[in-house]
Amino acid sequence: MEQLLHYVWKHKIFLLMPLQTTSGQPVEVIDPGLLNTDAGPDFFNAKLKINGTLWVGNVELHTQASDWFRHGHNRDTVYDNVILHVVGESDCEVYYANGGIVPQLLLHCPDNVRQRYDELRQTEIYPPCYSILASLPKLTVHSWLSALQVERFEQKAQAIAARLERCNNHWEDVFFITLARNLGFGLNGDAFEAWAAHLPFRAVDKHRDSLFQVEAFFLGQAGLLEEDWQEDCYYRELQKEFHYLQRKFELSAPVSGDWWRFLRLRPGNFPHVRLAQLAWLYHKEQSLFSRVMAAETAEDIKKIISARTSPYWETHFTFKKSSPHQEKRLGENALNLILINTVIPFLYAYGMHRADERLCDRATCFLEALKAENNHVTRLWSGAGLPVYTAADSQALLQLQKEYCDRKDCLRCRFGYEYLRGKK
């Protein structure tokens, strides 16, 4: 209820009857103020006329007036600058810390707004606002998707910053860890990130010129060289090499091989293949992050990250069992997903870190130039009448689903705002 009161106040969706305080003084809302997302009153710098006198200050909203006391505002001088207490139910008078009476307004939510809000909250259909999407003005759609895209960029930049802190601000390491996670393509994403974060990068770097030794490091630390398969010569060689590297660098125990999931995976996405591709890439590109950040075009980046494998994996998806010869290269779709989920967020985050707008703009341009992702979220929105053309669109819709639709947070959504206005 309080969220709905916030919405009605913020957008000045008032009934036609004049507003007045519970003591009968007329109220004119010139500016409802700025929503405060931190501690303190709910709206800052509101501009109101109460009984003909202009007031500028803060506004606090509650479902019930008595919430003022439950929250301790009557003992908190921070709330002494509240010029109006807006409530859904006026069950008592409220007071400042100095004992003065706080002007109070009983705000009624229009029935049609409440009904539409209940529709959005209770429907099982996704997206809940499907009935208005096709009729929304293009400018409304474009501006909201653009804002969501920036919001998603900023969230991913924060996640990268958190990884940087854990990795002593080593951009190359964090880029590789994020790349590894995204090569898990969802099902094995957590396992790949945990494995990559567990890698002794400086030890691996000492043997980076040898693809065989990098593979031994990667597969061994992934817990995939723990069994005794005498019949596979390449496996035995990798295992022997890994045991040598373990002793040389006093490596910590590998992650558990049980972390890796194979069910419902296409063989090309098996962990062994992805680890072999990462090993090849780590061996080939000794300054991977730096090269990617310096690349001018998306096609140049694809050439840099276009990984293959050592010859053994051209006839294997796992150890022991051979398969028909096939080069295990990253396909076009996989490269696009790596661009969308790894490279482009890093361009943006690195641009923010260096205050380099050129990198941030490049990230946006790359995203707008790539085709939209084809997944269940984009298909649902497209089916509801919202065109999805570029990766910028699809990333914005993923943000919308995660941060708004799944949380039923329609009051902060611009599509939800249009729905509540009655555009049906």
Regions found by a protein language model. Name each.
Residues 65-67, 90-92, 111-113, 185, ...:
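Short loop/turn segments at secondary-structure transitions that flank enzyme active sites
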Residues 395-424:
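Cysteine-cluster motifs in flexible loop/terminal segments that predominantly coordinate metals
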Residues 30-32, 41-46, 66-71, 89-92, ...:
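Short alpha-helical segments and helix-capping/turn motifs at coil-helix boundaries
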Residues 1-6:
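N-terminal "leader" segments that precede or initiate the main folded domain
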Residues 148-396, 409:
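Hydrophobic, aromatic-lined core segments that form the binding pocket/scaffold
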Residues 7-66, 79:
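N-terminal ordered "arm"
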Residues 44, 54-55, 60, 66-98, ...:
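N-terminal accessory interaction module
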Residues 82, 86-144:
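Compact, glycine/acidic-enriched structural inserts
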